[in-house]
Amino acid sequence: MLDRLKSIEDRYEKLNELLSDPEVVNDPKKLREYSKEQSDLQETVEVYRRYRSASEQLSDAKAMLEEKLDSDMREMVKEEISELQEEIESLTDQLKVLLIPKDPNDDKNVIMEIRGAAGGEEAALFAGNLYRMYSRYAELQGWKTEVMEANMTGTGGYKEIIFMINGNGAYSRLKYENGAHRVQRVPETESGGRIHTSTATVACLPEAEEVEVDIHEKDIRVDTFASSGPGGQSVNTTMSAVRLTHLPTGVVVSCQDEKSQIKNKEKAMKVLRARIYDKFQQEAQAEYDQNRKSAVGTGDRSERIRTYNFPQNRVTDHRIGLTIQKLDQILEGKLDEVIDALIVEDQASKLQQAES
């Protein structure tokens, strides 16, 4: 571990030199690339330097015990040794986590797709609750939400809604939301007061850059049609809605949220690129992970990950056995307590795999 940390520190120092090189300063692409790499390494280097300093102090303190000391001084040195050993143990744990390979998609924006599943209109209303929850969470983080496509029902729910959240590290926080979300509550239309169970599925895709997914125009079929509102009625006499079909993979994306066909096509291309990138990522991950399961789930969108129980104001994340009696707060976007617990569990699982 120490050899690896030394090489990381050497690379960090080299990057500092490169970032002051006039040739790099005048090359925006290199400057951006090196700045990001330096930023990614900075925390590891800072913790490593604290670890090294504490180790040197511990060595000096142990050497002092070999000298002639009065009883008071000896006790002070022993106390210092004990404190330094605790600090080194804590820093070692931090370094182990920092050395876990980082998900290359973590810094990206995220495209989220929510669909009402089992439960009819109640599932569509729950999909609307989830969309609002993620929108509020994004707002609390200072991120921006942009709707790409929405299929609204007559009662204000969503059969499907696709939206992008733009913000540094958005994917790193929201990628754990992949899966089936279950709601237990009494529907407004239920006169008997019986609790119904409905589900909605959430898919989280990292936004893919053009350089990451090579899509040729000849591989895309473009269809245009008149956009429609709730219930399917036409709301636009112009052919502004766009449907893109990627012929090699069969991935289909529609967008009718904008009045302009050009803007709808741009939005649809972003979603198409993300879905194709995600498809390749899923295939590669499945091959790599055949015999491994993450503690927070496989990312399978059919996997039930969380239950929202309205009568008891309770949220349960089934992957880590976490239960919180704060449903009202969570639906207002206060998701950090759940997401932080998932990240800790995921890191512990990866650390265990790395050490096995």
From Swiss-Prot:
Belongs to the prokaryotic/mitochondrial release factor family. It comes from Bacillus licheniformis (strain ATCC 14580 / DSM 13 / JCM 2505 / CCUG 7422 / NBRC 12200 / NCIMB 9375 / NCTC 10341 / NRRL NRS-1264 / Gibson 46). Disulfide bonds: none annotated. The keyword Cytoplasm applies. One of its GO terms (cellular component) is cytoplasm. Pfam families: PCRF, RF-1. The gene is prfA. It comes from the Bacteria. It is found in: Cytoplasm. PANTHER family: LD18447P (PTHR43804:SF7). The modification N5-methylglutamine is found at Q233. Its main location: cytoplasm. The lineage of its organism: Bacteria, Bacillati, Bacillota, Bacilli, Bacillales. This is Peptide chain release factor 1. Peptide chain release factor 1 directs the termination of translation in response to the peptide chain termination codons UAG and UAA.
